[in-house]
Amino acid sequence: MKIIFSPFFGNHVFIDLDKKGSLIGQKYAGSQELIGELRLRSGLTSVLPDSMERTAQYMKAIRSTFKENKGSHAEIFRSSFGKDELGVAMTLLGWRDALVGLGWNPSDYTKSQKLNALMDIEKHFDCAGVADCKRELLETLQAGQADLSGITIESVLPEGMLPCYFAALLSAAHKCGAKVVYSPAPSAAAAEG
């Protein structure tokens, strides 16, 4: 199978079939489609809950943190949480997901009270989101725990122009047997005159 990838492809990519011919054995994939395809082929299938379900689960985790640990770092959010549970849960979950997407390890305490608060809440939260799935996929491929032979991933962008996560993902996919082809880097052309 050949996956033609660009992080800038959306859900619907126009393909001129008169010029292209058949699409059998090919798939055009944006970011989420590539992640989904590689997760499926790595045996990491999962159904993600919607954002409101995750927010509700995070609210429960915050409540549990307050209830079970009176001296928790999360106490800094108690007053705000008492006034707007949903808003605070949405904000903190957004912070958490952004940090997970950047490789945050919630087991290492830091000098940051807010990070430590998120770590305390994390102990009561088990509801994976997109950032968790991306991290799990990258870790699985980097550990060589998938067989991706028979897959060709053709990046529309040169390797140096890919966002960091996707550059690492394609490199890890290559180590698992996928053939990865990058478009050539654009050459610099001097203006005439």
Where are these regions (language model features)?
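Short, hydrophobic beta-strand segments that form beta-sheet elements in well-ordered domains
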Residues: 1-14, 154-156, 181-182
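Histidine-centered acyl-transfer/condensation active-site motif
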Residues: 151-161, 173
